[in-house]
Amino acid sequence: MAFFGLSRVSRRLLKSSVSVTPSSSSALLQSQHKSLSNPVTTHYTNPFTKCYPSWNDNYQVWSKGRELHQEKFFGVGWNYRLICGMSSSSSVLEGKPKKDDKEKSDGVVVKEASWIDLYLPEEVRGYAKLARLDKPIGTWLLAWPCMWSIALAADPGSLPSFKYMALFGCGALLLRGAGCTINDLLDQDIDTKVDRTKLRPIASGLLTPFQGIGFLGLQLLLGLGILLQLNNYSRVLGASSLLLVFSYPLMKRFTFWPQAFLGLTINWGALLGWTAVKGSIAPSIVLPLYLSGVCWTLVYDTIYAHQDKEDDVKVGVKSTALRFGDNTKLWLTGFGTASIGFLALSGFSADLGWQYYASLAAASGQLGWQIGTADLSSGADCSRKFVSNKWFGAIIFSGVVLGRSFQ
């Protein structure tokens, strides 16, 4: 139950609104027992709204698909419908990091409020969630290979181009959002059957497929504006990645290796970043960099896929989590080792300094920690390990910058 620090005024309001006397206590318990056997939906009125009218504006989540939720208030059971889907978790009110993005209570999924629910106008919340703006880890994972490549393309003794890093950062945000929109449009029949995804905007009915297609058009148009800032070679190379972006969501229906296909897609920036700076490709440098990203993706996205493995079996979709099974950590160790090896080969071809190899040692430790400590039976722990990969990317980037700057 969410903890409410009560002021004197609030306690007075509560006292006047909820008073339990010995004579009424038994009646309340009897009525509560009766309500449990024959549930009646009533509306819960937060006493804070009498003193602070903005309370509901800040902490109510306007979304669809919420069901009856039971809460206990000072020892008295109350049945009420979560008005507009307000979460009962204390992490939102107290500002603490949430352990998981959902809680289950008797089969009911309660979604925690994000900054989108608290601060954005109601009209745009669905679109912001469709682009996963409240979950930036996907943008980081798409952006880091681009940044590695841009830093590798810098001249010896120089820092990477801030112009290209800014362009690719914005491009990563837009392309990741477009990829999520495409994924939700193609997977809406699957998302409704998986606990983790059933509240996504299109699957839950918050947005229609037509609205999703219109939003996708806007995302791609903005992405085109960024692509046109690059040279002709990079424009063609960047546009060719759309085939992978549109194909990836379908792979889980046909192969146990959709994570490998995601690796080919999300690490395309390892090729594009270099060509944007240099105007051509250097296979001995960027191909090992690209392959290292693919192997890295197989590590983190397999860990991520273990969150949904039970639902995947029920729905009939495939993943490396199901393919590897009990041997997952052995496979991940192999892919992690290959990723570090390809990174070392790329750095050697680029003639980077010793600072780069020191960063590889640190990145190896981070990746080994992920694989060694991941609890693949815990969705929350898999999610935490997945999110930690932004630090792996940051370590490699810092190593490339230092190795090139002191070259």
Swiss-Prot record:
PANTHER family documented for this protein: 4-HYDROXYBENZOATE POLYPRENYLTRANSFERASE, MITOCHONDRIAL, PRENYLTRANSFERASES
Source taxon at top rank: Eukaryota
Name under which the protein is recorded: 4-hydroxybenzoate polyprenyltransferase, mitochondrial
Disulfide links within the chain: none
GO molecular function, one term: 4-hydroxybenzoate polyprenyltransferase activity
Tissue and organ distribution: Expressed in flowers.
Places the protein is found: Mitochondrion inner membrane
Pathway: Cofactor biosynthesis; ubiquinone biosynthesis
EC number: 2.5.1.39
Gene3D superfamilies, per the entry: UbiA prenyltransferase (1.20.120.1780)
Transit peptide endpoints, chain numbering: 1-20
Native source organism of the sequence: Arabidopsis thaliana (Mouse-ear cress)
Family per record: Belongs to the UbiA prenyltransferase family.
Topology in membrane: Multi-pass membrane protein
Transmembrane segments: 137-157, 162-182, 210-230, 254-274, 279-299, 330-350
Entry-linked InterPro entries: HB_polyprenyltransferase-like, Prenyltransferase, UbiA_prenyltransferase, UbiA_prenylTrfase_CS, UbiA_sf
Cofactor dependency: Mg(2+)
